[in-house]
């Protein structure tokens, strides 16, 4: 049985509007999409903000603990975050 390759969450944008975001795992990369309302079309999010990457990392860590994703995926996402946001602090104490 294959693991679900989509992870979604909600956040607010800079203008205070609620936004739905989902990340889709394709090969070795994650593609991000967003929309404002349930029946709006999903639009590709070409440059996801740091907060979205951290939401994805948190969700992947939880899925790894439940054996829904492979542990290597955490390292791949952390590496990608460091490439995109070199000044960012990524704490890994949750792996414990």
Annotate each predicted stretch with a short phrase.
Residues 35-96:
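Mixed-charge, Lys/Arg-enriched low-complexity segments
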